[in-house]
């Protein structure tokens, strides 16, 4: 499945959404051996952030996903290579980027050799995994995880597809959410950038 996702083609279109302030973006995937496009994820205003009194975008399931299925691999500009994940998240360049509002920084195990690569997903393309928010501060739990290698995988039984016929609050179980980890939030505390700023996605 991971190899097929890597070789996928992606397309997207804006769809009118009467329950929100702006259209939502449906992202479609076509596998290497398929002729058909299928909805994969949806970028829309985040129901999680709304619950926290904030505004920003979030990532939703465009089709139903079940536990163990992969959505894609986290991509982004390579910031640097480090011996450990903590080294990556506490490096001087990481702090500089965070102070400039780059909050899509993720450390993943290096594809070639030991150590970790720090990726800045700020301008990454489809399937826009960097848009997934952390549910910290709400009563919601994560429904996906990011593996050491940077693959986003469903961890709860079933994530239903986003529906344009439902409100954002009614779609909240479709929003993809993962725990960024204590190291991520500890760094924001150290730098004086509060959690509210850190999780906001523009």
Spans of features found by a protein language model:
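Short, flexible/disordered secondary-structure transition segments
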Residues: 17-20, 72, 187-192
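Catalytic cores of histone-lysine modification enzymes
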Residues: 16-17, 25-145
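Short linear sequence elements within intrinsically disordered, low-complexity coil regions
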Residues: 22, 31-33, 79, 87, ...
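C-terminal SET catalytic tail plus cysteine-rich post-SET Zn-binding segment of SAM-dependent SET-domain
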Residues: 5-8, 136-202
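Eukaryotic intrinsically disordered, low-complexity, charge-rich
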Residues: 1-19
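Intrinsic disorder/low-complexity segments enriched in polar/charged and small flexible residues
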Residues: 12, 39-42, 74, 153, ...
């Amino acid at each position: 499945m991971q190899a097929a996702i890597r070789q996928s083609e992606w397309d997207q279109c804006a769809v009118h959404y009467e329950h929100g302030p702006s259209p939502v973006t449906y992202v479609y995937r076509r596998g290497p051996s398929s002729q058909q496009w299928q909805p994969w994820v949806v970028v829309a205003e985040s129901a999680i952030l709304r619950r926290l009194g904030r505004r920003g975008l979030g990532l939703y399931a465009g089709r139903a996903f079940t536990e163990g299925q992969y959505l894609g691999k986290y991509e982004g500009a390579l910031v640097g290579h480090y011996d450990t994940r903590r080294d990556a998240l506490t490096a001087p360049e990481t702090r500089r980027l965070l102070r400039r509002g780059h909050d899509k920084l993720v450390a993943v195990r290096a594809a070639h050799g030991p150590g970790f690569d720090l990726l800045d997903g700020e301008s990454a393309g489809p399937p826009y995994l960097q848009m997934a928010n952390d549910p910290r501060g709400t009563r919601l739990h994560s429904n996906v995880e990011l593996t050491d290698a940077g693959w986003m995988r469903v961890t709860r039984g079933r994530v239903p597809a986003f529906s344009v016929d439902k409100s954002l609050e009614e779609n909240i179980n479709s929003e993809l959410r993962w725990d960024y980890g204590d190291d991520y939030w500890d760094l924001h505390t150290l730098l004086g950038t509060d959690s509210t700023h850190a999780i906001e996605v523009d």
